[in-house]
Amino acid sequence: LELRVAAYRSLTHSDLLALMGSRPSTQRASLYARCRLALSADARRFWDARSELIDAGIGAAGKFERYFRIFARRVLPLVHRRRTVLELLVPRSAPERAEFYDHQWDTAAWRALFRVFFSETVLGWLGRDPSFFRYAEGSVADHLLARVRHALVVLDPSVNPYVAWILTGTHGESLPHALRAEHFETIREHLDRLEWHQLPIEAVVHRDMVDRIDRANLSDIFEYMSEDNSAALLAQLASRSRPGARFAYWNMMVPRLGASLLPMRLRAMPELSRRLFLADKAFFYRDFVVDEVLP
């Protein structure tokens, strides 16, 4: 995050995309050098020792992102030619997408290799911390395969930056909102509003680092937590939240519903949650949940 903030401060929009890996580039080392002095000493030491991650694009520096990079470069070519991958990303109607998926993409070789590469064993070895599966329910590969069909048929892959990133290693013409040109100056002008802390989220509450919470994006934090610990965290957050505050989070392999765990403090918003989930371009999750804090 600190390097991304420095990149917004120090680079043009096109150079930001190059450093992130959204666009091909051979100049990432020099782009990093322009951001380096805007980093703390700890962040400089971290990135100075990881030039290979910079050369690959800092957007792919995480373990899960590197896992997808292996998939695009080493696994996918075993079952689909580059031309087929690019054809998948051509704009089509929903019936045309279904036709292409069923007759060109969803081959027996694709399904077999996908189930191996996205099995719990391989995913735990290369892509996720093994603790991710402690509370998981069901087959990871089967879940992801079903979600892939949703992303490639129900949604339009030609305008999905995450599909393009996973399959080609770049975002193509479609970018995540935070990287779009029309938002670049707005983000740059408000970078001073950001804070980052290397702490458990519970510590942020206990140390009075927040006054009142209006909104909380909890990502997929509950994938790594037991039901009791999830309920305890939600109670702590609710105690620091204004009435009407909203918590948003994703479920992938661990079903967690805050309003069920904490019915006296949280109200489910099923219609909003479902509408956003069906449109979510981050397609590998099983559910997207929005809860509202009760008075």
PLM features: residue spans?
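Conserved class I S-adenosyl-L-methionine
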Residues: 248-271
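A short SAM/SAH-binding and catalytic strip from SAM-dependent methyltransferases
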Residues: 213-228
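A short acidic, Gly/Pro-enriched loop at the edge of an enzyme's catalytic core
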Residues: 199-217
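Conserved beta-strand signature within the Rossmann-like core of class I S-adenosyl-L-methionine
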Residues: 215-217, 241-256
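Core SAM-dependent methyltransferase catalytic element
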Residues: 269-295
